[in-house]
Amino acid sequence: MNSLFASTARGLEELLKTELENLGAVECQVVQGGVHFKGDTRLVYQSLMWSRLASRIMLPLGECKVYSDLDLYLGVQAINWTEMFNPGATFAVHFSGLNDTIRNSQYGAMKVKDAIVDAFTRKNLPRPNVDRDAPDIRVNVWLHKETASIALDLSGDGLHLRGYRDRAGIAPIKETLAAAIVMRSGWQPGTPLLDPMCGSGTLLIEAAMLATDRAPGLHRGRWGFSGWAQHDEAIWQEVKAEAQTRARKGLAEYSSHFYGSDSDARVIQRARTNARLAGIGELITFEVKDVAQLANPLPKGPYGTVLSNPPYGERLDSEPALIALHSLLGRIMKNQFGGWNLSLFSASPDLLSCLQLRADKQYKAKNGPLDCVQKNYHVAESTPDSKPAMAAEDYANRLRKNLKKFEKWARQEGIECYRLYDADLPEYNVAVDRYADWVVVQEYAPPKTIDAHKARQRLFDIIAATISVLGIAPNKLVLKTRERQKGKNQYQKLGEKGEFLEVTEYNAHLWVNLTDYLDTGLFLDHRIARRMLGQMSKGKDFLNLFSYTGSATVHAGLGGARSTTTVDMSRTYLEWAERNLRLNGLTGRAHRLIQADCLAWLREANEQFDLIFIDPPTFSNSKRMEDAFDVQRDHLVLMKDLKRLLRAGGTIMFSNNKRGFRMDLDGLAKLGLKAQEITQKTLSQDFARNRQIHNCWLITAA
């Protein structure tokens, strides 16, 4: 009776134990990452040939305590290696784990290799050669704290390498994990199975091999026992012959079918090749098809199972497309696959919530370093009067209502960029802005009292509903998460795409960047203020302080300003402003751009202007600014400096975003200035719901 160990992916240990017991293994004991078991020589070969779940089958040889590198050397050498190796057999050592003595796995492997080689030379036997790439024998040593466990790896290459997949091909899941996903899916062999995002076909191929009683090891060319002196070739050939007979019989008797599709023609070609090499190509129909084209291949029955490992992303900019994909799949399942089962394996449970289906069962597993979940659903049969529910229905209805109202208004106004939704419903705490045929969804960061998982699920529902209501392509939706504006947050850089979109605002053409920064380069709430500046600027010298991307300067220039001066501390935004000016034909000496700390520049400047626009941050303590600035505390100092630059009869338009800002009218009067609040006049229809988004004033000589 041999003592053996089968390793597997985390989360699959109990499933592997059942599989090994069905093969005839006894004394099975589950540990993290595998199963210890016992069996005769035939069971050794059967576990190698038939286990769909084991990563490797090991033959433990012994353990030793390792307090020094000499302990490791002597512990390994104590094993009778000369009775383990066939003459001329090559070997390789895989060493994992470290302790205070063995701090490098390569060093540990070298000490093991030396001990094995010396075991032969001490008996005056030819020393075995090392072959790291294709050894006849693999020795596995695992060091945990002070104990080293030594074993022969009878698998050779990992058992997930069935022999049907090109090793160069990238697989998101190993074949062993794919087999477990099939087993847990609830699918019954003999019923249809469909994978609408099949990639190279691994799930379908593993299912077809299982259904046709085809051993997963049948197509492997190399094994780890080929150089093992105790290998029994006769028993191995019996096990192999039995597997071949069962495979032929299973294929001949199988009557159901498998269906796979993917939008990538290259991976579909690879899937067809893999299925053919696995010996079950005739059972699977592969098609190049997007999920949006998914249809029930058997509308008249029988019912089957949809099984897939859909894509999931770590990057924020990939989420809208993935949310739309899962939402679409959920709708298609309800519309076309009533009575079927659905099973999805994913590293993102939140994405699975976009299906709008209730899971009957779920399982956890590891896919490499990723924590994953597999959820099984039963899709109820639809009735003639059944209507699929939309995620975030209240939000969708409000967005639909706003769209009807603002789309026509924006067209009449001659603007392409406007706010469609601004946290109208407190439970859907986002802003939705339209930029031509693009949409930006900004999630206001939820309070810490809100469960993060629930908040994320709600955001996914919002995105799915937004895409559906607006009828936009998922790649035209940009998702951002932000807190309510604080100081210089608007300048935070998020990416490096450098993709600019040209939009129109009245008679101005402007560049926006929807992805690289927290803001887009165009503050939509200041749209009317910019138009007013254009109407006030004819024949005047115009100054724009804290200019951002210079959109106000563009309006002033198009309004006929004699000259424009644009000042900002950021070189990036000044270059952006220059591009905006050039886009509108505003070039030459009349249009100056100055990179400077605006407060310092203001104190030193001695020029005169007829019209000044200033939109300072609420608060700023930038390292590049000489002093911290607070708009409530410091606005009178600002006005004093601005008055010095203001030509007789001139006007200052002053705006800021501080909620509850109070203008010091008495202080202004002492400076010889007066202020007229024009906030309500500068709020367009799309911002009428949020009357505190900014405040705006016209300031002139008293």
UniProtKB/Swiss-Prot annotation:
Q: Which reaction does it catalyse?
A: guanosine(2445) in 23S rRNA + S-adenosyl-L-methionine = N(2)-methylguanosine(2445) in 23S rRNA + S-adenosyl-L-homocysteine + H(+); guanosine(2069) in 23S rRNA + S-adenosyl-L-methionine = N(2)-methylguanosine(2069) in 23S rRNA + S-adenosyl-L-homocysteine + H(+)
Give an example GO cellular component term for this record: cytoplasm
Extract the GO molecular function terms from the UniProt entry.
23S rRNA (guanine(2445)-N(2))-methyltransferase activity; RNA binding; rRNA (guanine-N7-)-methyltransferase activity
InterPro entries per record: 23SrRNA_methyltr_KL, DNA_methylase_N6_adenine_CS, RlmKL-like_Mtase, RlmKL-like_Mtase_CS, RlmL_1st, SAM-dep_methyl-trfase, SAM-dependent_MTases_sf, THUMP_dom
> Keywords in UniProt for this one?
Cytoplasm, Methyltransferase, RNA-binding, rRNA processing, S-adenosyl-L-methionine, Transferase
Q: What does this protein do?
A: Specifically methylates the guanine in position 2445 (m2G2445) and the guanine in position 2069 (m7G2069) of 23S rRNA.
Give the family this protein belongs to, as stated in its UniProt record. Answer: Belongs to the methyltransferase superfamily. RlmKL family.
Name used for this protein in its record? Ribosomal RNA large subunit methyltransferase K/L
Organism in which the protein naturally occurs: Escherichia coli (strain SMS-3-5 / SECEC)
